Amino acid sequence: LFPVPYEGILSLRFVQGIATIGAFSLAVTTLMDLGGGHGRNMGTAGLAIGLGTALGSPIGGQLYGLGPFVPLYAAALALFGAGVLATLATDRTPGSQSTTPLAIVGTLREQWSLAVPFAFGFVDRLTAGFFALVGTVYFQSELGLDAAGTGLLLGAFFVPFALFQYPMGRLSDRIGRIIPVAAGSLAYGLAVISVFYAPSVRVTAVSMVLVGILGALVAPATMALVTDIAAENSRGVAMGGFNIFGSLGFLSGIVGGATIAGRVSFEAAFLVVGLAEVFIAIVALPLLFRLDVPVVPWIEKQERLR
């Protein structure tokens, strides 16, 4: 059509990011308003997000073979269809306490406990950003994989991460959020480290599958924890704050991971990212037990029936 300067493309991407995160947060907030178990609902969101991420790259690659702009046209058409479907959803608009960008700060001040899932969300997305860039470079430069092999290894993570989120979300409705979030994060961090120390590509693939399953254990429980804590009239603000911290974590994983890998080593980068997950699990454990949410719901239910 006409040449666009690189700065213009970056500006367009910035606007696209604003629109995307806004629609994404509102879509998840709509699920927060539904009954039937917050873990199940957040697992549904995670299933959709994970499948989209897992299928986006291979489908985009096939469409690119038809032409460089075909993936963009197809994505625009898919987003338009999603927007039309969104008009059919039942909307719930309770009176909100505040609609300003600083509402997140006010919500955190009133409900300090939201900082706990926000912190977990930051570190969880940090690992995702880390694998998106540093993991890809590591697989190709250190393991000698080509683009197809790298895609298979990333798929070993994304497929179980997507498919297990719904059952893991339902599990958190039964056993509570604390066990999946704390124990899951601890095991998840160790699994991330195991990817580097895997002695072969096959073992690396197994480690990536384990990372995906454990990530699916943590992700819906963390989002459900936000839903459990947030007041009914501030769920949108709470989920928006969660996504802000998550996006900052994703960016930190890319920039921080690349910096450590470039200046120190891949081993140091994997250790820092994995131990960050372990650290947040250990440090936040006392805070998790102080939250006003059931630790083990089935035991508390039995005690109420006595």
Where are these regions (language model features)?
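Helix-loop-helix hairpin linking two adjacent transmembrane segments in secondary transporters
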Residues: T44-L88, E267
